[in-house]
Every structure is written in C-alpha cells, then in structure tokens.
Amino acid sequence: MTWSTSFLSVHFFAFITTSIHAQLTGSVGPLTSVSDKAAVKTCNVLDYGARSDNTTDVGQPIIDAFADCGSGGLIYIPEGDYLLKNWISLENGSAWAIQLDGVLYRDSSPSSQSYMFEISGGRDFELFSSNATGAIQGSGYLYHRDDTYTGPRMLHISGVSDWSVHDLVLVDSPMFHFVIDGGYNGEVYNMAIRGADHGGLDGIDVYGDNMWIHDIMVTNKDECVTTKTNSHNFLIENIYCNSSGGCAIGSLGSGANVSNIVYRNVYTWDSNQMMMIKSNGGSGDVSNAVFENFIGHGNAYSLDLDSYWSSMDAIDGDGIYYHNITFQNWTGTAVDGETRPPIRVICPEDTPCTEIALVQIDLWVEEGGYDEYICKNAYGSGYCLDSATGTSTPYTTTTYVNSAPTGYEAPTMTDDLATAFGTSASIPIPTIPASFFPGVTPISAVAGSS
C-alpha cells in the first residue's frame, strides 16, 4: 500500500501502439442505396391495410409488405401513429429496407418475452427514419408499475450481414431495447434509446464481427452499449450514456472470445460506471482493446475491470485472460472515490492480466477528500499496476491520492438529465440530440437536420 500527495501518470507505453489501431476490418452497412431499393419496388403499408389511427394493427401489413419487397425494395411506413398488435419477424431478406417515419405503439398483447420487431438472416438491409422522428414506443411502464421486468423485447437483428439501423428512437421497452446477435458488417448510428430507471432494460447488447456503432444516446439503468462474447473488430464511438448503467464488456463466462475492440469518445452522466469489464471465473480470452477519450460525471464507478464480479454467480474455470488492453485519456469526476475507487483493475489470481496500460487517467471525487486506486494481479504500466513480467505471484496494490490531478475538469452536455425516468408513468419520446460527445458533431448528419 502506498500514499502520495500527487500521482505521476505514465504517458507512453511501447505495447499500446498496435492495439490502438484495432477496429474495423472492412466496409460496413448496406450494399445498395435506399434510392436503388425504392426504384425496384416501394411497398407502402397503407396499401396493405395499415391505418395511422393507433387502433388498426400495423404488424400484419408490414409482414405482407415484406412478402412483396423483402427480396428487393423499400417498405414505407409514413408519418403517423400505428398500433403494433402482431409482432414482426422477417427472415432472409435481400437488398431491402424499411423506412419508419411514423411511431409504432406496442399493443397490450401479446405478453411473451419475444421481440416486437425482429430481422433475421439475409443481407443488404437498412432500417431507418428519413426525418429522425420514427420511433417504437414500448409502453414498458405498464409492466414496470407492477414491479414486472419480464416481458416483450423491442428490436432484434440476428445473423444479418451488410446492414444498418439509424436515425430511430426506441422508448420504454418492457425488457431489452436493442439486441444484435451475430451482426456482421453492420452500422448503427444516430439513435436515442430511452428506458426506465431499472436494471434489465438494456440499451444495446451486441456481438458479431466488423461492427461500427456511433452517435448513440442511451437512458436506462443497465447496459448502455455493451459488447458480448464472440465479438471482434468493433469500433464504438461518440456514445452518450445519459443516466444509464454505462458501457461494458460482458458479463463473460466460459469460452469468452473478444478481440480488437475500440471504444472512444464516450460521455457518461449519472450512471453506474463509465466502463466495466465483468466476469467471475470462467475461461477464454479478451485481447487487443482500447478505451480512449472518456468523460464522466456523477458516476458510481469509473474504470472498472472486475474478474470477481459479485453480481453474477461464479463459473468454473481459472478466469478469463485479459491482455493487451489500454485505457487512456479519461477525465471527469466520480461520486465517491473513497468507497468506489475510480480505478479498479481486479484480475484472476490464477490467470493474471498482462499488457495492461493506464494512460492519463485524470478523475477526481465529488464527495470525500481523496481517490483510491486498486489493482490486483494486473501487470503492465501506469498507476497501481505492477510492472513485473513473467510472474504469477498474487498481489494487491492500493494507492491513495489526496490531491486532484491536473486536467480532471471536463465539459458537460446540454442534454444531461436532471432526474431519471421512473417506472410508473409513460416515458416521452425524445429528440435525437445534436451531439453525443462534447465538441463533436455526429459522423453522419442526423436525418432532417439542416
């Protein structure tokens, strides 16, 4: 254990040079443009029996339109309010798109845990709003007010390649908002996801290969944008966790397999953590990851790699091997750096972490008089990490810092929520913000913006 009145950051590590470039391996998104798809055929759901009266079911008209346009064409849902009675499951489409300019409202039935809107298989797909006001309203509060958090999930992309989802709003799902299983060459951007202040209402959960997720705002109290196992070559940037659970990798169990992941430009406000990598036992490998340019305010935890995460049951195995992972350029404040250390790197005793880099982590407390940093069985460079190599001797180092680091102060965002949304009343549909990270404009202009 050490005590210091100042803390010296290490600004350069030889082994981070290659890891910082880990991201995409090729092009992402649809193979053909929306205009080309529309030129083949356009299927307006109003021609298939839909009505913008929030009474007539729009689910079956969308399914019927897919029969005509799912092998080449555009399904068009005009502005207006539509009732979603029949859940939508569309499979193995090609060269097709859905333009959702209206708002879909979940009907009170069915009540199963299945997905309200599911796209599986196929390739060259796009789901978007041309005016950035297209939305799905899940009315999850009708479950949550009765303390029920098991129910329908909202949007699911499964086994699709060369695709995108953008300029949409997802609101108040009874359970998970957006799940991506086996997404390949996909792009997700310009979205606002807003859920209740409770666990189990994940924003985006994703696994796959060659994925670009950017310019996303999430409000809930669970996963913001979280990478699951079997994920490779991800670039996740310009993320706004606005009173959320925060971003994460995990939770990870047996046979974990995650590599070449970049999170950058992540802004986290009033959330559970800025970034958490979580496991408890298990096996496998997480490697070649970079977490850079993080800003946080009012969060419970900040930088948290926890291989003994107590919120999941322990899994058989010596632990996941975490290696070649860099955290750099973090600024802002934590609620209480004494009881919840802003730096926590807790690695398995039998499978120590190696090649970990902590670079310019400038975080300070909002309450209390000092920061606490804790590293356990973690080897690399910076802060409380042990620089030794070739050893597996268990260790724990706790460092106390009683003066604020230079440069910890960081900007806030105008859309920061003063209070979270509860669980007993309808959550209003938000506007997609003009920015998702301080001083940075969206990579692609939000639809309909001037």
From Swiss-Prot:
The positions flagged as glycosylation sites are 54, 92, 131, 242, 257, 324, 329
Main localisation, per the record?
A: secreted
EC number from the UniProt entry: 3.2.1.-
From the UniProt annotation, give the residues forming the signal peptide: 1-22
**Gene3D superfamilies from the UniProt entry:** Single-stranded right-handed beta-helix, Pectin lyase-like
Q: Which enzyme class?
A: hydrolase
Cell compartments where the protein resides: Secreted
A GO cellular component entry from the record: extracellular region
Q: Which domain of life is it from?
A: Eukaryota
Q: In this UniProt entry, which cysteines form S-S bonds? A: 43-69, 224-241, 347-353, 375-384
Q: Name one GO biological process term.
A: cell wall organization
Asked if the keyword Disulfide bond belongs to this entry, the reply reads yes
* Keyword field: Carbohydrate metabolism, Cell wall biogenesis/degradation, Disulfide bond, Glycoprotein, Glycosidase, Hydrolase, Polysaccharide degradation, Secreted, Signal
Q: Which InterPro entries match?
A: Glyco_hydro_28, Pectin_lyas_fold, Pectin_lyase_fold/virulence
What molecular functions are annotated in GO for this chain?
A: polygalacturonase activity; rhamnogalacturonan alpha-L-rhamnopyranosyl-(1->4)-alpha-D-galactopyranosyluronide lyase activity
Q: Which residues form the active site?
A: 222, 297
Pfam families reported for this sequence = Glyco_hydro_28
Family to which this protein belongs: Belongs to the glycosyl hydrolase 28 family.
Q: What role does this protein play?
A: Pectinolytic enzymes consist of four classes of enzymes: pectine lyase, polygalacturonase, pectin methylesterase and rhamnogalacturonase. Hydrolyzes alpha-D-galacturonopyranosyl-(1,2)-alpha-L-rhamnopyranosyl linkages in the backbone of the hairy regions of pectins.
What protein name applies here?
Answer: Probable rhamnogalacturonase E
Its source organism is Aspergillus niger
